[in-house]
Swiss-Prot record:
Gene3D superfamilies given in the database record: Ribonuclease Inhibitor (3.80.10.10)
GO BP term (any one): positive regulation of Ras protein signal transduction
Keyword check for Repeat: yes
Regions of compositional bias (Gly residues) in chain numbering: 26-47, 84-93
UniProt record similarity statement: Belongs to the SHOC2 family.
PANTHER family referenced in this protein's UniProt entry, alphabetically: LEUCINE-RICH REPEAT PROTEIN SOC-2 HOMOLOG (PTHR45752:SF167), LEUCINE-RICH REPEAT-CONTAINING (PTHR45752)
Full protein name: Leucine-rich repeat protein soc-2 homolog
Region (Disordered): 1-146
Organism whose genome encodes this protein: Drosophila melanogaster (Fruit fly)
Amino acid sequence: MNLCSSGATASTTSLSSTGQAERSGGVPGGGAEGGGGSGNSGGGGKTSNGSAEAPTLCFAGGSGTAGAIAGTEELSNANSPANGAGGATGSTGSGQQPTGSNGHSHLHNENNANMPPETRPKMVTVKHPESNKPKPTTKKSKPIQADQDVIKALQRCRDEGIKRLDLSKSSITVIPSTVKECVHLTELYLYSNKIGQLPPEIGCLVSLRNLALNENSLTSLPESLQNCSQLKVLDLRHNKLAEIPPVIYRLRSLTTLYLRFNRITAVADDLRQLVNLTMLSLRENKIRELGSAIGALVNLTTLDVSHNHLEHLPEDIGNCVNLSALDLQHNELLDIPDSIGNLKSLVRLGMRYNRLSSVPATLKNCKSMDEFNVEGNGITQLPDGMLASLSGLTTITLSRNQFASYPTGGPAQFTNVYSINLEHNRIDKIPYGIFSRAKGLTKLNMKENMLTALPLDIGTWVNMVELNLATNALQKLPDDIMNLQNLEILILSNNMLKKIPNTIGNLRKLRILDLEENRIEVLPHEIGLLHELQRLILQTNQITMLPRSIGHLGNLTHLSVSENNLQFLPEEIGSLESLENLYINQNPGLEKLPFELALCQNLKYLNIDKCPLSTIPPEIQAGGPSLVLQWLKMHSPYRQM
């Protein structure tokens, strides 16, 4: 039996309340193809020369755009949404006509709507003794079932020669066999529905080029899909596929294949047949091995196999010489093959969070790379001079590894770099002059290392904007830090600092200063010169008083001085007009608060826990910070202001 023979079409007389849509004239499918509709379901109108335009049909919740299909997927580790659950909808209740698989329900209610008012059945409310909730004896009609509307949409698609059909986000569970009649279709969007399987008749759409099936409940594909020999883009993200359906390997015209977030465990050798693929995404599956067949896909430009269970890559990966983006992050890779050096077009290589102890020296051949990221591995050192060979690098991320020193290669390796992240390693020294050529370096993260001192040439880092030195063993800051006048963020928490140099006042662009958990006893008066400061974090130190100049910090919104030895707060704190959060908890010597605190009109949060505030009645303190502020306002000499 030929599934694609026209035959008799199913009767839809009882399904249509408005009749067949009016034709706009011309030959169905003639003229220009409708592009990028906005969700309208109207047919194509005549063009200015009188020829008919092939319309685009969008349905129900569809967006009218091809948003489900992208040219490439980002090499990100963003969380993926859960799969859409499958299953039928529209269970029946008492007093309701059962709903059939074709969605022909509530027809009697539609007829009732056309009756004269005097002949319609009345809505009678009955109150049951055991319930206060009124229960109607006749149920109100529900919206037309989504699967029923699909029949209408397909009929219109057939009649008007529509080339682009968007049925996305419509709670569809079944695609009827009448889809075979939509032979003009080149784009079909069925994403974000509840489809469990496709009918064999899908193979009749021989002109199809784009097919979006992502976010459904598919476990397989019909063999007839191989008849769609012009298919270029196939999107199967977020389904329930336990394997790559064999029919896919016979779709040799495919250029883009998305299989992200399924349950695939293996890739068959037949993959080598898809020689026209330029984009392949197998992200977030359960694949343990990528066979040699991958090397046959010489036209690939983007390959995403991240978030799987790969331990090795085949040497054949080096045959994919057109790759510009290769995402291997979040696997269990123990090594990278030397053939990776053949990928001279590579711009982005994601190797984060694997089990690598080294990377091959051949990577220095990949001179087009602009980002080098091996975060979350066990690497102790990079091949000598490798970073210097990659002269196009702008960001380098070596965090969460086992580096005991900076990579070898000298200042040349950072010439064009603007961001360096070496967080969470075992580095005890920043080499003198290592950044002498890094004129564009604006961000350095050395958090969680073993630094005991900063290099003497720190004053030459004049373009630095963000400097994170938290969780080291620093005992002092050099006075030359005053030269970092572009600095906006300075993180020095969890060190062994006893004082802050007066030259800190030269950092006039500073917005965030974090000195938490040090051994600081006194803040310099020059702190008041930081007029752009928004967050000042001083908690867990040994500070006994805040300088009166703190009142000059007009942009300060967050001040934390908890867990110190404060005896009082300066009355100038009332000048902090932008202050929203104030933490002064756990200062055992703080017995009173200045009335001027009531002048901080934007203060939203005040933490005074474990402060012996003897001047404020206990019942006021027990009422919480808001009541304390109210008390201060009521008893303040400024209450008339």
